[in-house]
Amino acid sequence: MKPQVVFVLGGPGAGKGTQCARIVEKYGYTHLSAGELLRDERKNPDSQYGELIEKYIKDGKIVPVEITISLLRREMDQTMAANAQKNKFLIDGFPRNQDNLQGWNKTMDGKADVSFVLFFDCNNEICIERCLERGKSSGRSDDNRESLEKRIQTYLQSTKPIIDLYEEMGKVRKIDASKSVDEVFDEVVKIFDKEG
């Protein structure tokens, strides 16, 4: 069976992680966060990519696509090897730019199907406030205002065009993510119930 993938996109603080956790619980998807995989890999002393990832994350830059895709593939392969029924994946925070998308199409063409793109649309100021709140407890080095301004710029320049591209293909399911967690999840449920 081929992996069925839903790409989850939205700016920093749009609530991607929070909503993904709920989707996993309700629909049995496996959640793969590109950012988390990279952060874990960065901490792994045996990783060949660790230092490289560290440098990119510190500078608020997007990590080279080969690294991200190899981590995503590894996770999907391991999940499906352990349980063949588990072939539904939420991939969160990817593809983040044109390069990511081309890399995915080149590497994963025919190997995985993208069902749709779940787009959490959220006003920048709300996103920044949420991240600053999260930064107090998350210990994430990039949850500070300066880093956030950079991450939002990167998102607007790089990721938004990808969403527009999928929009043209009729694959985007857009959600107003500025509402409360429960209200947002109600919208998510409508989409997943319809898409199956």
UniProtKB/Swiss-Prot annotation:
GO cellular component terms, semicolon-separated: cytoplasm; nucleus
Primary location: nucleus
Keyword Acetylation included in the entry's annotation: yes
Region of interest (NMP), residue spans: 33-63
EC class of the enzyme, as a word: transferase
Swiss-Prot/TrEMBL cofactor(s): Mg(2+)
Residues found modified as N6-succinyllysine: K106
Binding site for ATP: G13, A14, G15, K16, G17, T18, R134, K179
Ligand binding (a ribonucleoside 5'-phosphate): R39, K61, I62, V63, G93, F94, P95, R96, R140, R151
Domain remarks in the Swiss-Prot or TrEMBL record: Consists of three domains, a large central CORE domain and two small peripheral domains, NMPbind and LID, which undergo movements during catalysis. The LID domain closes over the site of phosphoryl transfer upon ATP binding. Assembling and dissambling the active center during each catalytic cycle provides an effective means to prevent ATP hydrolysis.
Family: Belongs to the adenylate kinase family. UMP-CMP kinase subfamily.
Protein name: UMP-CMP kinase
